[in-house]
Amino acid sequence: GVQKSDLFFRVGTIGFEQAALGKIAETSPGLKIVNCAAGITLSEGTHGGPRGYDPHIWVSVRNARQMARNMYDALVEEDPKDKNYFTERYNALDSELAQLDSTLTAILASCRGAAFVIKHPSLTYFARDYGLKQVALEVQGKEASPAQMRERLDAAGKAAPVVFFIEKGHDSAAVVNLAKSMNLPTVEISLLDYEWKDNLLAVARAVARQCADRAGRSE
């Protein structure tokens, strides 16, 4: 359990994680808590709270590289005798992530400025990385009022989105129907699945495919 651990890696600004940190520190006074979000420029205003930091930092390859670096540094500091092992594994991971970032950049090269709709603003950092525009239907990560929803839908219409992302296991039938009413193609994604790399590639390919289709129709 946590009591027997030397390090605790926190993702960053996830609500339930922050709520638990006080108790964890109290019951495990010798535990070192490592903030994996250190060095990442957090996006503000998409979620509730004083500054509304977006907690979904892992939905970004560039953020993931920084998170891996933070973990590597903490491990080397805690266990310097195994630095060579940690360095070898870290370098392999960083190389893989750099290649994935290059692949995503290439897939989305012709889509800069393209917009997509999603209920919960979970793709903020992904959109930032590749010059996309996320139109979230929630307000600061919470259900929108009828008036707010009208504003969101107006914003979506003006942004001319190419796809509506449905989050598997989270979005209701009403959200699916809303996407249909907007005459947008829908793509189901699951950003918490183990196959993280495949999910990010699926998001990129969906945007690229719809950008290409729209460009073809306009010719």
Label the model's feature ranges.
Residues 1-219:
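Extracytoplasmic metal-acquisition and chelation regions
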